[in-house]
Design a protein with these regions (language model features):
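Short glycine/serine/threonine-rich phosphate/pyrophosphate-binding segments
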Residues: 92, 118-128
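A conserved hydrophobic secondary-structure block that centers on an alpha-helix together
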Residues: 109-118
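Small-residue-rich anion-binding loops in enzyme active sites
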Residues: 9-88
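Glycine-rich oxoanion-binding loops at beta->alpha junctions
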Residues: 81, 85-103
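Conserved small/polar residues in nucleotide/adenosyl-binding loops
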Residues: 130-136
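Charged, compositionally biased N-terminal leader segments and the immediate start
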Residues: 1-7
Length: 140
């Protein structure tokens, strides 16, 4: 595992899956159902569907809104609320799932995860909270 790409940039997929044919079907899905469908495109069968759904549900169980990231409309303006996570940071949306993803693969390999945190920003609190709840991680 690595934090940055060899060139110092972010890690991104070589190609993105084609999803246009799924958009109409996805329109009616809940946040967790949609998350599952999207993550299935990127996990290439490495995580069984049932386990991935369990991971998605666990990741967002601590969010304070039943829709996880509800959309609020004010006239013609639509706003996606990303602050309902455990630390109120928008980063909770990604990091809650990422922590569970790390835990899944590290548990399969029987490896612990140790995190040394040194930050005062919202990323640090979002990462810290994620790993406080994982049995395979230690946070310093």
């Amino acid at each position: 595992m690595m934090g940055l790409a060899d060139d110092g940039g972010l890690l991104v997929p070589n190609e993105l899956p084609f999803v246009e044919s799924n958009l109409d079907k996805w329109r009616t899905l809940s946040f967790t159902e949609l998350s599952l469908e999207i993550m299935l495109l990127f996990t290439s069968g490495r995580i069984p569907r049932e386990e991935l759904m369990s991971m998605v549900k666990k990741s967002y169980a601590s969010f304070r809104h039943p829709e996880i990231t509800p959309v609020k409309s004010v006239g013609k303006l639509h706003v996606l609320e990303l602050f309902h996570g455990p630390t109120f940071a928008f980063k909770d949306v990604a990091l809650q799932f990422l922590g569970n993803l790390f835990a899944y693969f590290l548990t399969k390999r029987n490896h612990p995860l140790r995190i040394l945190g040194a930050t005062s920003g919202d990323t640090g609190s979002a990462v810290s909270y994620t790993h406080l709840t994982l049995p395979t991680s230690d946070l310093v």
